[in-house]
Curated annotation (Swiss-Prot):
InterPro entries: Rossmann-like_a/b/a_fold, TilS/TtcA_N, tRNA_Cyd_32_2_STrfase, tRNA_thiolation_TtcA_Ctu1. This is tRNA-cytidine(32) 2-sulfurtransferase. Gene3D superfamilies: HUPs. Its EC number is 2.8.1.-. Homodimer.
């Protein structure tokens, strides 16, 4: 009996610690990019996956203690895929008491009609889904659209564009929608996928499979994801350093003439960002930038159990 109580206390402690870290990550991203402002109505796009469930939970949590007032409305797009469990999200959201809207659009049928058998359907499906979500945001009077992409997604997109697209381009935490009418935010931009996975497992969210349409994972993205996971395992801190690099760009030491006026460098020009000192042997820190030791999720500090609960 005592052993069971100890395990339960340990689980509660670890969940609270994890939730605090996710809250901190989301709060920092919101502040850094001014994602949420006074009076905002945030449309939280809920797919039924671990990321969007976590995003909704953390935003609800922050809503209670934030110094500004904002409202949330959860939106799910039922695309009429075979086997889609229509009851899961409404039942879950009803238990939370969250305002929500289920949008029913047979995009699955449109995609099947337009795309030949065996060809990838993701591109057309994504465009259709995006248009519907933008329309829904307008109908609901939403000022921001929140998507559940996390830090790993952002890094994967950076490497996809580098390896296959020839661009240094990632996935911005905040942007103007392609129709020019909506601001899209990614509150999980600073969150690690493994933290989100642990949180979703601990909270036992009612996960809906993401491959009901029969589509296969993007092979190129999967290769990048495997590469990053391997690096993270073999070289602790590398992921943090790469993400820090995305926030610390030095255009004068790259090759994009649109970002820096290389032609304008003449005799008498000022030294920019250290000039050629960048090519001298630099002192490399013992630990990568932004790296912190992995926390042991199995440790239990019973003295702290009563003070770490997230309200």
């Amino acid at each position: 009996m005592q052993e069971n109580q100890k395990n339960t206390k340990k689980e509660i402690y670890n969940l609270n610690k994890l939730q605090k870290r996710l809250r901190r990550n989301v709060g920092e991203a919101i502040a850094d990019f001014n994602m949420i402002e006074e009076g905002d109505r945030i449309m939280v796009c809920l797919s039924g996956g671990k990321d969007s469930y976590t995003m909704l939970e953390i935003l609800r949590n922050l809503q209670q203690s934030a110094p500004i007032n904002f409202s949330l409305v959860a939106v799910n797009l039922d695309q009429k895929q075979p086997g889609f469990p229509e009851h899961v999200l409404p039942e879950y959201l009803e238990t939370l008491g969250v305002e929500y809207k289920i949008v029913e659009e047979n995009t699955y049928g449109i995609v099947k009609e337009k795309i030949p058998e065996g060809k990838t359907t993701c591109s057309l499906c994504s465009r259709l889904r995006r248009g519907i979500l933008y329309r829904t945001a307008t109908e609901l009077g939403a000022t921001k659209i929140a998507l559940g992409h996390h830090r790993d997604d952002i890094l994967q997109t950076l490497f996809l564009n580098m390896f296959y697209g020839g661009k240094m381009k990632g996935m911005p935490p905040k942007l103007m929608s392609d129709d020019g009418k909506h601001i899209v935010i990614r509150p999980l931009a600073y969150c690690r996928e493994k933290d989100i996975q642990r949180f979703a497992d601990a909270k036992a969210f009612p996960i809906i499979p993401c491959n009901l349409c029969g589509s296969q994972p993007n092979l190129q993205r999967q290769v990048i994801a495997d590469m990053l996971r391997d690096w993270d395992k073999r070289y602790p801190g590398r992921i943090e350093t790469m993400f820090s690099a995305m926030q610390n760009v030095v255009p004068s030491h790259l090759c994009d003439t649109n970002l820096f006026d290389f032609k304008g460098i003449t005799h008498g020009s000022e030294v920019v960002n250290g000039g050629d000192l960048a090519f001298d042997r630099e002192e490399i820190p013992l630990q990568p930038s932004g790296w912190q030791p992995e926390e042991d999720e199995n440790q239990l500090d019973e003295l702290r159990l009563n003070v770490v609960e997230v309200k």
